[in-house]
Amino acid sequence: MNSTASTPSVSWWRPLAKVDRWAILAIVIIPTLLFTIPALFGHPAITNDNLIQNFPLRALVGKIMATGHLPLMNVYINSGSPLLGGLNAGAFYPLTLLFIFLPPQVAWAINLIAIYITSALGMYVLLRWHRLSPVASLAAALSFTYTGAMLGQLVHLAVAQGFALIPWFVLVFLSLARRLRDLPETATLREIVGRVRTSVVWFAVLLGLTFLTGEPRSIAEIELLGLIVVPSILLIRSSYFLVSWKKRASYLLTLGVGGVLGIGIGICQLLPGWAFIGSSNRAAISYWFFGSGSLSVKWSALFFIPDIFGGNGAVAGPGYFVNYNLAEVTSYAGILAMIGFFAFLSRLKRKGWQGEDKDFVLYVVVAVVGLFATWGSFTPLGHIFHGIPLLKSTRLQSR
């Protein structure tokens, strides 16, 4: 193939091959067994912040809504504290509604299973869209889902819920660009709307779900993802590059419409949450506080060897022996991801990546920007990240 711009759009799922069906079955079975078997023996995955915040607050939401009332107030904290506005309960997230009808631990297990199916399936579908083989796509999907932040942030349910949607967001961004690329330059407004309406719906739903998680860090991560991916799609010449300004404008307008609809879906959580944050100490975060959770550049070795500074002391291993919270360093991506990343870097030629390799340059950009975001105030670029709305109100970049 001489030009990535001529890459045809391929619906790999029509028909769904047998190997794809087996891969999807594995994606469903693994988290189902992982979370149900320990729970059946009295060891549900409820620890740390999930134990003291996320699980009991969701159980409280279910109890309140079962009586026919909205989950507006938690009367059991101090003299009362906002429950919906407090965000941690994820009160209107669709799967939180299961706590109304099911025993809390059962509803919790279903939530966890759904997160990890969503994550792995999203990465699998994204890579199959990129025309990678089923085996490679499955390996990458499992590596993404069961290493790094997806596994390390299991103790923060809503963070994991937001992270699980990342592959789906990238897929929407890329597929929308390719849909518009395939349109003739003479396409009418009706033809453009007909081509992009599916992407509008998907983007709105994904954005709405992110808002409904009630997790500012998930929302900020998706914000940062969009700020990286969308400009990269518009600037990097690849199979989804949009040549004309008309198509670029249509691309941005489509995302804008989807964004407005997504805000409409999540507005019931956004408004009380924003009001609550506005009256808290998170309303104005200093640069020092913002950067207090940044990862020192010299500790980037944790990306490759997560226990290089010790671990939890299990199985005669050494305990953690540096002055930082081990649980907050969750960037380990796994050996498969590292091999794949450096193998791709080895294909770089003097004139850059060539052919279909250009489609994956986007992920190098994400990795580089992600590194600087993780290092935060340890680099001069930390001030740039502190200037991004919403992101500047979060901390713990090492997550």
Give residue ranges: language-model regions.
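Membrane-helix boundary/interfacial segments in multi-pass membrane proteins
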Residues: 153-160, 318-329, 369-399
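Structural signal for the C-terminal ends of transmembrane alpha-helices
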Residues: 34-38, 170-181, 230-241, 342-353, ...
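Membrane-embedded helix bundles of polyisoprenyl
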Residues: 28, 118-130, 134-181, 188-236, ...
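Periplasmic/ER-lumenal interhelical loops and adjacent helix-loop junctions
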Residues: 55-72, 258-347
